[in-house]
Amino acid sequence: MENYTLLPFFGYLCANFPKRTNRKAIRTHDMKLTPIDRAPLLPLALCLVAGIAVGNPFGTGWPLMVVAGVLLAVTLLAGRWPLVQSLGVGLCFVVLGMLVAPAEEGGVADGVWTEAVVASPIAERPKTVMADLLLTPSGERRRCYLWKDERSLQLKPADNLVVSIHDRQFVSRDGWQRGGNGLSHLSAFQRLRLKALLWREWALQRLHASAADADAQAVVAAMVLGDKRALTRELRDVYSVSGASHVLALSGLHLSIIYLLLTRLTLGRHRFWLGQVLIVASLWAFTLLTGLSTSLVRAATMLTVYALFALGGRRHAPLGVLSFTAIVMLLFDSSALFDVGFQLSFMAMLGIILFMPLFDDKSPGLKSGIYYKVTHGAGINYLSRGWWDGIKRNSLGYLLVSVAAQLGTAPLIAFYFGRFSTWFLLTNLVVIPLATLILFGAVVVLLFPAAAGLLLMVVGWMNAFLSFVSRLPLASIDHLQPSVLQVVLIYVVIAVIYALLFRLVGRRR
């Protein structure tokens, strides 16, 4: 048997890039595997997460490097004991996670004047102006509140400042002035990101060309460009109670819709490779334009890997791709692990990857999914053929994806936000098709601003529907306060449910 223990990444590639020969044997082998069996990178990703969560107890990297060297040597010498090799590789990734774990915050002391660069659009508050500042040359990023006046209201991304910060976030009226050369300390990528924020401001002006409902404009800005500054507290509560907050936060849902649109617009099969290159470049350009949120980076990375598989004519293991994406993102920015958006994005995708094969009648390794049984019953197709059949099947697909994603994220949502939306199925059945229409319409509005009125009218309909859902009886269960242990136990119960469902649905022989 081939052993990929020492080279997990290349082993993963070999496992997912089978030779074109003996396809029947490959299919027979795949039928016996669960999604977890097809993800050899999953244990390594979990080990990396564990190392980052533990952190570096020594304060310096040298002791950990010595430990990593010893573990690597033992792993290389343990060729006759695969279990020892596997444990060695896992421990190496734990140590790697400890090495890349974010250090404790230090940074610039209070009251010290330092150069800074405005790294976000300003957001007005009753008495202050909120903005993210990049403190140079240390590179520390802080969310600061400046005294609101005519000067602070004119700030924009990429402006050079000299500031004196108190209590780590407050800047007085006389505590800042324009000047310095902070941009020179930034990398080319950071300067490009600041330039992208200016482009986003231009795009926002195009979207706001129509003097329509302010709430509708705020929703379009959040959905299309990730700008939530104009969202009122009441509007946020409506989306939260109805279970549609994920629509306001740019995520894999939005990027998948854009991917679908670009796929329809690209060239034919004889130019397939060029179409995939253009699609991937466009996805990353959009991700950069909207601020490189963790959920979008996750989705863009996964779609890029999928495009590479498509160009090679190979199959992919979604859970393996998700694990690879987590490893890459955490190695570049280990602090992302503690970001709520990162956790929700990966857990939602994990729920979809694990549970959707149980619902889908075309999934390998299953006799017939729940999706098949619901739509066909005991050998009878209750859904008529044709366009009406397509509407029903797509509607059921939206519901099943919502359930799968909710199974992955509900415990975390209850832990962080203390709320569970009970009408999320009804919400997603209407909101997901409307979100698709709104994103398509936003592209048209960027080219033809005169069409903004029609787009904002559709958004107004969506807002009205969500407002209706938020007023339904028992629209949400509030004041939930689960502990970390309770969240872990809930996920254990979900894992048991998954195992039982997998056995219930059955495998092909």
Where do the model's predicted regions map?
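Short aromatic-glycine-enriched beta-strand elements
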Residues: 123-132
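Hydrophobic, membrane-inserted alpha-helices
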Residues: 45-53, 68-74, 256-263, 279-287, ...
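Short nucleic-acid-contacting surface segments enriched for D/E, G, S/T with interspersed K/R
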Residues: 149-163
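Aromatic-rich juxtamembrane segments at the membrane interface
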Residues: 32-38, 46, 170, 174-308, ...
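Structural detector for short beta-strands of small beta-barrel domains
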Residues: 109-124
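N-terminal leader/targeting segments
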Residues: 4-107, 171-173, 177-179, 298
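Membrane-helix interface "capping/anchor" motifs
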Residues: 38, 77-86, 267-275, 310-321, ...
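Internal transmembrane alpha-helical bundles of multi-pass membrane proteins
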Residues: 292-495, 499-505
